[in-house]
Amino acid sequence: MVDVRKIRLILELRESGIVNPQVLSAIEKIPRENFVPKAFRNQSYENIALPIAEEQTISQPIVVALMTEALEIEKSNKVLEIGTGSGYQTSILSILSRRVYTIERIKSLLVTAENNFKKLKLTNIVTKHGDGNL
């Protein structure tokens, strides 16, 4: 089934200057609605940040796209992400790279993210609970 909202978002990202086809394809493949609470799923393809849990937010899609495009990721790359959140950005990075290492300080968010990765069968993500302190 074609999701008109997702198509509209991809077009909006293109109009905003996102040109990397791999980035746009990764965003199209990852269902953003899986990464937000049920109460906000109807807004999941609007270009806005949304609350997730623990007073945290999922980034606005244009921010995710700009950051991802700026990385110039290649499939052979390994990526370190600080702040997993619900796992949306992590999932996009996993499509574009060989492996993603991600750390999250809030355990409940990490558990949610790990469940999201399992649902999407994303197996190249290594998670860690912690604040990054050595």
Question: What positions do the PLM features span?
Answer:
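N-terminal auxiliary segments of SAM/dcSAM-dependent transferases
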Residues: M1-A39
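Conserved alpha-helix/loop element of class I SAM-dependent methyltransferases that forms part
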Residues: R8-L11, E15, N47, I58-N77
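Cytosolic histidine kinase catalytic core of two-component systems
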Residues: P21-Q22, I62, S108
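Conserved nucleotide-cofactor-binding alpha/beta core module
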Residues: E72-L134
